[in-house]
From Swiss-Prot:
Enzyme nomenclature, EC number: 3.4.24.-
Molecular-function annotations in GO: metalloendopeptidase activity; zinc ion binding
Protein name: Protease HtpX
Organism: Shewanella baltica (strain OS185)
Binding positions (Zn(2+)): 139, 143, 220
Record's cofactor remark: Binds 1 zinc ion per subunit.
Stored NCBIfam families: PRK05457.1
Length: 287
């Protein structure tokens, strides 16, 4: 109940702040053009702010410990492997970090190819062979080299804009319909209108998440292909086979899970950020 209240309160606060900002900027959201500007500013703005602080957020939320000076042979091998793969991929050396988790997982994040972070869990580091880990690292380096963080940020910005724009257009249509059938012609009223917008934001948001998940799955196949080139097809397949045999991964924060090696499994594949491991293995074997 508390989470629902916070979600509603946050949404209303965002709407209030957005309205104030648009008023200051002189943008008239009662027109389609003004509404589209409003939607684009907040749709892309939120996505790019998330991208800009992605490394900082990852370190804070996942408790990542960046390896500045390797403390043992395992950390030294980890850093050297990422450095070698980054050079092969033609990108600047990412920061390398370890985070405490029993899950066998890893992720890449960062605002650009030259400002990125590759992090692995302790569960993966001590639960896989070096060949398997090399495949995982190559997958994450490929995400960085392919510019997937920026690509998905642009996609997220587009769908955010759609959600904000469509929700308010539909809410306006509903408001006009109610107003035309109301003797006083008052329509929904401010709070009812905001409630309708909130519900529509949630509904369109579900549709948007399906679209983003679809593109995320495509990028996963591309990262697997890149990993096969950097580390060898056998190592990438071995890593995926090892993940398939292990327990289901618990969910990471959304901004990291899209670029993780192991996504959360779901009955509805269209909601998954990662294709099923069986399909990824089959795609690699067929390539």
């Amino acid at each position: 109940m508390k989470r629902i209240f916070l979600l509603i309160a946050t949404n209303l606060a965002v709407l209030l702040v957005a309205s104030i900002v648009m008023s200051i900027l002189g943008v008239n959201t009662s027109t389609m053009g003004g509404l589209l500007v409003f939607a684009a500013i907040f749709g892309f703005g939120g996505a790019f702010i998330s991208l800009a602080i992605s490394k900082w957020m990852a370190k804070k939320t996942m408790g990542c410990e960046v390896i500045t000076t390797p403390r043992d042979s395992t950390e030294r091998w980890l850093v050297e492997t990422v450095a070698r793969q980054a050079k092969q991929a033609g990108i600047k050396m990412p920061e390398v970090a370890i985070y405490q988790s029993s899950d066998m997982n890893a992720f890449a994040t960062g605002p650009s190819k030259d400002n990125s972070l590759v992090a692995v869990s302790t569960g993966l580091l001590y639960g896989m062979s070096q060949d398997e880990i090399e495949g995982v690292l190559a997958h994450e380096v490929s995400h960085v080299a392919n510019g997937d963080m920026v690509t998905l940020t642009l996609i997220q910005g587009v769908v955010n804009t759609f959600v904000i724009f469509a929700a308010r257009v539909v809410a306006g249509i509903i408001n006009n319909f109610v107003s035309s059938n109301d003797e006083e012609g008052e329509g929904l009223g401010m709070f009812a209108y905001m409630a309708v917008v909130f519900v529509l934001d949630m509904l369109f948001g579900i549709l948007a998440s399906i679209i983003v998940a679809y593109f995320s799955r495509i990028r996963e196949y591309k990262a697997d292909e890149g990993a096969a080139r950097l580390a060898g097809k056998g190592k990438m397949i071995a890593a995926l086979e090892r993940l398939r045999q292990g327990p289901e991964s618990t969910a990471m924060p959304a901004q990291m899970s899209a670029f993780g090696i192991n996504g959360k499994r779901s009955m509805a594949e269209m909601m998954m950020s990662h294709p099923p491991l069986e399909k990824r293995i089959a795609a690699l074997r067929a390539s």
